[in-house]
Amino acid sequence: MNGEDPQERPDFIRAIINGLERYNPEAAGTLEAYLTQQCEEKFCDCNANRALLKLYQLNPDRIKDEVITNILVKAMTQFPSPQFDLALHLLSPSQSNPGPNSSSELTEAVSKLRALNAQLEGAEYARFWATLDSDDLYADLTTDIAGFEDMIRVRIAQLVGQSYREIQFPVLESWLGLNNSEATTQFITETCGWKVEGDVVQIPKNADNEARKAEIREDVNVDMFARVIKRSWEESA
């Protein structure tokens, strides 16, 4: 997963974000269309999306609330990473850190997306799914992102596979936000390629989850050893 420099990025987008064209207000439309492509084709180009947010900073009359929320949702799918916060910091203070009296639709949306992202970054996966299901607004905010829930599940599974050799089935089911054992088993076996044995999910050994014996070695040269002996002799004298 490379959300910073994806292979799907076309040359004309690369020319915009790497050249002076990134300051041209007319480039906003091109970058917006490219964001739509990302949402439909399930890839993410955070670099290009930040270029669009920077254009919005310079040209506030061009701001589109739906584009901002789509950028944040796409950045969220890159967890754990700083991508969401990097995008958030390009919004105005009233949007990214609204006060208690803020009531605009965008500030409310940003606040809710921040909460979701914090739960993913904190590995509070079961809580994330509960929050996502708690308000219809979340469905509205993610509706443009094709396969959003599946992308989150796959990413959670990748992180689990890097950390565990086995995990309790009910725990993983809650982390994946799946509500029945049949769907969970299908995801585990077909998408992840793991095995279910009773209430335990067996995860194959890989470079990340393999237990390694820690080897601690200290090289002590003759001079260091001599100083220790001398100090011990002086203290006992």
Curated annotation (Swiss-Prot):
A GO CC term assigned to this protein in UniProt: eukaryotic 48S preinitiation complex
Span of domain PCI: 44-219
Superkingdom of origin organism: Eukaryota
Pfam family, one: CSN8_PSD8_EIF3K
Protein keywords: Cytoplasm, Initiation factor, Protein biosynthesis
Subcellular localization(s) per the UniProt record: Cytoplasm
The keyword Cytoplasm is assigned to this record: yes
Major place of residence: cytoplasm
Listed GO MF terms: ribosome binding; RNA binding; translation initiation factor activity
One GO-annotated biological process of the protein: regulation of translational initiation
InterPro entries: ARM-type_fold (IPR016024), CSN8_PSD8_EIF3K (IPR033464), eIF3k (IPR009374), PCI_dom (IPR000717), Transl_init_fac_sub12_N_euk (IPR016020), WH-like_DNA-bd_sf (IPR036388), WH_DNA-bd_sf (IPR036390)
Job of this protein: Component of the eukaryotic translation initiation factor 3 (eIF-3) complex, which is involved in protein synthesis of a specialized repertoire of mRNAs and, together with other initiation factors, stimulates binding of mRNA and methionyl-tRNAi to the 40S ribosome. The eIF-3 complex specifically targets and initiates translation of a subset of mRNAs involved in cell proliferation.
Subunit structure: Component of the eukaryotic translation initiation factor 3 (eIF-3) complex.
Family in the record: Belongs to the eIF-3 subunit K family.
Identification of the protein by name: Eukaryotic translation initiation factor 3 subunit K
Natural source organism: Neurospora crassa (strain ATCC 24698 / 74-OR23-1A / CBS 708.71 / DSM 1257 / FGSC 987)
